[in-house]
Amino acid sequence: MIDAARRSQGLRKERTLASPRFADGVFRNASGATPGLRRGSTGGVLRDFLRGGSRRFPSSPLPSVSPLAGWSRRVDAPLRATWLGHSTVLLELGGARVLTDPVWSNRASPVGFAGPRRFQPVPVALDALPALDAILVSHDHYDHLDRDAICALARRGTPICTSLGVGAHL
């Protein structure tokens, strides 16, 4: 596990160390929040994962429509959401465009040869995205924080919004 305080500098480090959620080098959930599976419930999930066979992958490509035509004009509705795969959604809210958890890599992994693979490609190239007002990164798992995608988007100058601990990676 990465010590967020060690990776942080300046004001971010001060805020990390002062956070009531930060202790012993890691951020902790508030009392009562118990992430993960309940005791005794993991056996079936693990068995399905290891022996699931064809049930683990779609039998054919999922239907997909290019979002490019819709993005060429601003939305009239108060909200439009375009799902781009797993955790990545382009939200259009009151004229602003916010991209959540941009993942464009083929695998959710720190290396390109291992880790869970996409069922199908992202429906649009990263450089074909419209101008963005903000990027929201919810947390630092590989299926939500794709380093290559974030670096490419950061070069556009779009603000990246995330929590204190995740900001240390950026």
Can you annotate each of these PLM segments?
Residues M1-A128:
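Metallo-beta-lactamase
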Residues S87, H141, V166:
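A generic "binding-loop/recognition-motif" signal
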Residues S163-H169:
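Short, polar loop motifs at secondary-structure junctions
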